[in-house]
Curated annotation (Swiss-Prot):
This is Uncharacterized protein YwkF. It is found in: Cell membrane. The chain crosses the membrane at residues 5-25, 31-51, 75-95. It is a multi-pass membrane protein. One of its GO terms (cellular component) is plasma membrane. Keywords: Cell membrane, Membrane, Transmembrane, Transmembrane helix. The keyword Nucleotide-binding does not apply. Pfam families: DUF5316 (PF17247). The keyword RNA-binding does not apply. It comes from the Bacteria. It comes from Bacillus subtilis (strain 168).
Length: 95
């Protein structure tokens, strides 16, 4: 999780640079918001939360325990990487 958090912090540094380079074209809210939505969306997709109950049951029975664990770790890493962008998005909206 430390690597995912570090990647998230690097991502907000890159997002801040993009916002500084293109101040008229992109707002900080848009940059942080889009990055947050993309990372949370990837976490939802990789975790399997966006499937129906019957699909989830079929995936559970056809998937190995190691595969399920690695998929959940990947989803958690995407979500942890999204946390800094979400916090920056909230800070730009509130202040």
């Amino acid at each position: 999780m430390k690597k995912a958090l570090t990647a998230g912090i690097l991502l907000i540094a890159i997002e801040s640079m993009i916002g500084t380079i293109f101040p008229q074209a992109l707002s900080y809210e848009a940059i942080f918001g889009v990055a947050s939505l993309v990372l949370v969306g990837l976490a939802i997709i990789t975790s399997g939360l966006a499937v129906s109950g019957s699909d989830q049951r079929a995936n559970y029975h056809s998937e190995t325990k190691e595969g399920r664990t690695s998929r959940m770790k990947m989803a958690a890493a995407f979500f942890v990487a999204a946390i800094p962008s979400i916090l920056c998005y909230l800070l730009t909206i509130l202040f």
